[in-house]
A protein has these predicted regions:
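Active-site cofactor/cluster-binding pocket
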Residues: 1-176
Length: 176
């Protein structure tokens, strides 16, 4: 497990509809709750559902001058296309978490695969894959506290969606 750093540059990559932009916003909100500075950007492929979707998050204790990820520390790849795009960065020390449900398993240092989509589906809602994978990432790399993410989830959701997303967060954290 990495020690606590001052700055994290994170890329969340997958396909439109997987909730990665929301995950990036929520990660940023959790960092703000902890008194950190945050920049969050996103881009979409040709189709909002199905095309490559990217969310970038920079978390820093200092002021953030350049607002795009230049040297990612952590990448979440929820599709084969996303993993293909970034897999080579693992050799340069970038920690990559990927979904073995939708991407071919790979061996190598800094490559960590979990069946995020299958677990989310087993929980009863594949849409919770974003929060489940955030739980695993933040448990492995302490960029924000799990309690901060849970607080953001409590502010954004209610009723059954709240319960489901808190359970997805717990399941993700439990993978590590």
């Amino acid at each position: 497990m990495m020690g606590k750093k001052e700055r994290y540059e994170i890329i969340l990559a997958g396909s439109g509809g997987q909730g990665l932009v929301l995950a990036g916003v929520m990660l940023g909100e959790a960092a703000v709750l902890e008194g950190r500075n945050v920049v969050q950007t996103q881009s979409y492929g040709i189709a909002s559902r199905g095309g490559l979707s990217l969310a970038e998050v920079i978390i820093d204790r200092e002021e953030i001058i350049y607002q795009q990820v230049q040297e990612p520390d952590i990448i979440l790849a929820l599709t084969e296309e996303a993993l293909e795009k970034y897999a080579a960065l693992a050799e340069k020390g970038v920690r990559i978490f990927y979904d073995t449900t939708l991407a071919k398993p790979r061996a190598g240092a800094n490559l960590t695969g979990y069946p995020f989509t299958k677990i989310a589906s087993d929980l009863g809602n594949v849409a919770s894959v974003n929060i489940l994978s955030l739980g695993a990432m933040t448990a492995a790399v302490p960029m924000v506290k799990t309690e901060s993410l849970a607080g953001v989830i409590r502010k954004r959701f209610q009723g059954k969606a709240l319960e489901m997303n808190l359970e997805a967060l717990r399941k993700g954290v439990g993978l590590i």
